[in-house]
Amino acid sequence: MPDARAADEPAQRLPRTGNPATDYALALLAHLIGAGVRDIVVSPGSRSQALALAAAELERAGAVRLHVRLDERVGGFLALGIGRETGAPAAVVTTSGTATANLHPAVLEAHESGVPLIVITADRPPELRGIRSSQTTHQDGLYGVAVRLAKDVPAPSGEEEDVATAARLAVESVRAAVGAETADPGPVHLNLAFREPLSVAVPPLPVVERGALPALAGAQKLGRETVVPGIGPSTVVIAGADAGPEAEEYARSAGFPLLAEVSSGSRFGPNLVVAYRELLREPEFGGRVRRAVVFGHPTLSREVPALLLRDDVETVVVAPRGRQAYNPGRRAVIVGAVRPAVEADPRSPEARAWVGLWVSASRRLVEAAERVASPDATAPDLAKARSLDPSDALAFARMELAAVRAPITRPLLAEALWRHTWPHDRLVLGASRLIRDADRIVPGKRLRVHSNRGLAGIDGTIATAIGVALASQAVAVETGTLPGITRVLLGDLALLHDAGALLGGSGEAWPNVQVIVGNDGGGTIFDGLEVATIASPAAFDRVLYTPQRGDIAALSTAYGWAHRVVRTKGELDQALSAPPAGASVLEVPLER
């Protein structure tokens, strides 16, 4: 922990207004910035006005990026998206009352995903609590075990010690959010009481120093060591959500097949097995596995937990951060890191045969699935294209035209989106049926993929994507690198559930973000569950499939987003290859 006196010094350089709320708010936010915070999200409110006005002046001074959102739930997920992309906590500021509860979904997702986040809620002072004061509820401890640090901060009194206390609290909060001492990053809750007068005008600010983020503590803080699994028995590497490139590197260097989910950040490399679900069900593949090394949080299949529940499969879970680790059988060995055995040789005949068995079988299955999904698709006949015979040229043109006019299916949509996304872009996948379609077919490609798989809810998907877009594109501008586009793939229900995220203030900057919605008229993800076979059609449609009356085109226009409907493969490819142009919605009608 930094020395308290060092934390006090910048506070003395801030202007003093004589208003306790304003002076405290300035000190707290300035020191959050000094500890590594780069983004503040504000929702309007009276009790939090000192924080909001201080944030505006800090943005004017060039110290921070400010984002204003009317809906606190949207603001929470926006901050979550920023934290996902940067690894730095964004601070989200709300007033008291129900505003604080609207942050709870984002807090829970940040908790389960290990995303740093700082929640700052304004509150009444003690004398106004418990007497039915307006817009007052019990906010202390509101988020329970989901936060890494919770502080109920007394109302500042205007004493000199107030700003020093705020400075220390800011440093402590950032360190808790990033897991500097615990290796357990996640949300922090600061509940700040303010007495009237709630603010005064903020004078011009001096230069506010922007500090570096503290480093994440090592896995040894969790008592997890680095282990070296041997070269046998028959081993696979499983990469779930947020596993990152480390899973691919280990699988390749150790000579093991890589079963990587589309949201893992590990879905690339020569050892990748795309059709892992089908192969895990087969005795000659899944039945031969005797050890699994797991990275990240697998959530997209039933076959993976079924494998790890088997008594004859040894499970090693790599969890360098977070108190909880994925452990469906409750008997996995939880470690901080893995290294290939010294004797491991990925080029050995045994390793090549084991990996090759999985990779080649996966390739055959994917090709077969593509033929089923697009039975009319054929490879271009280049001989006809080069032929001088007019009939050959005409036949080739007809084939190409048929391919362009092909209707869009879910696999085709997922494949096209994946193909048109580049490493400098960002891809956000919602908790809809489409993420599973993508997981079944898209090939290896090193992309930055985000998905809220901590709790896998459909809420907040668009807001998260906008946060990812704002953060990634701001960093690109600052570093002089090529800014990409952020695309989010989701279903119609997920879009309608987060429709408020499409709303932005007239003074807010909007990034290049494209929302691609597969509109199949409801929750078709339930069609593949057991409930579809036992419920009556009428009851199933009403309470699970839940078709909505929403008009996505009208909704997009009302909120100022460009909207386009695409129905064919050619239209889809054209829309995805067009240069980024602000905020847009691409609606793709799909059959149920």
Curated annotation (Swiss-Prot):
Family matches, as SUPFAM superfamilies: Thiamin diphosphate-binding fold (THDP-binding)
Catalysed reaction equations from the record: isochorismate + 2-oxoglutarate + H(+) = 5-enolpyruvoyl-6-hydroxy-2-succinyl-cyclohex-3-ene-1-carboxylate + CO2
InterPro entries: MenaQ_synth_MenD, THDP-binding, Thiamin_PyroP_enz_TPP-bd_dom
Protein name: 2-succinyl-5-enolpyruvyl-6-hydroxy-3-cyclohexene-1-carboxylate synthase
Keyword Cell membrane annotated: no
GO biological process, one term: menaquinone biosynthetic process
Co-factor note (free text): Binds 1 thiamine pyrophosphate per subunit.
Cysteines paired by S-S bonds: none
The enzyme's E.C. designation: 2.2.1.9
Subunit organization: Homodimer.
PANTHER family from the UniProt entry: 2-SUCCINYL-5-ENOLPYRUVYL-6-HYDROXY-3-CYCLOHEXENE-1-CARBOXYLATE SYNTHASE (PTHR42916), PROTEIN PHYLLO, CHLOROPLASTIC (PTHR42916:SF1)
Associated pathway: Quinol/quinone metabolism; 1,4-dihydroxy-2-naphthoate biosynthesis; 1,4-dihydroxy-2-naphthoate from chorismate: step 2/7; Quinol/quinone metabolism; menaquinone biosynthesis
A GO molecular-function annotation: thiamine pyrophosphate binding
Database matches in CDD domains: TPP_PYR_MenD, TPP_SHCHC_synthase
Obligatory cofactor(s): Mg(2+); Mn(2+); thiamine diphosphate
Similarity comment: Belongs to the TPP enzyme family. MenD subfamily.
Superkingdom of the organism of origin: Bacteria
Signal peptide: none
Task performed by this protein: Catalyzes the thiamine diphosphate-dependent decarboxylation of 2-oxoglutarate and the subsequent addition of the resulting succinic semialdehyde-thiamine pyrophosphate anion to isochorismate to yield 2-succinyl-5-enolpyruvyl-6-hydroxy-3-cyclohexene-1-carboxylate (SEPHCHC).
Keywords: Magnesium, Manganese, Menaquinone biosynthesis, Metal-binding, Thiamine pyrophosphate, Transferase
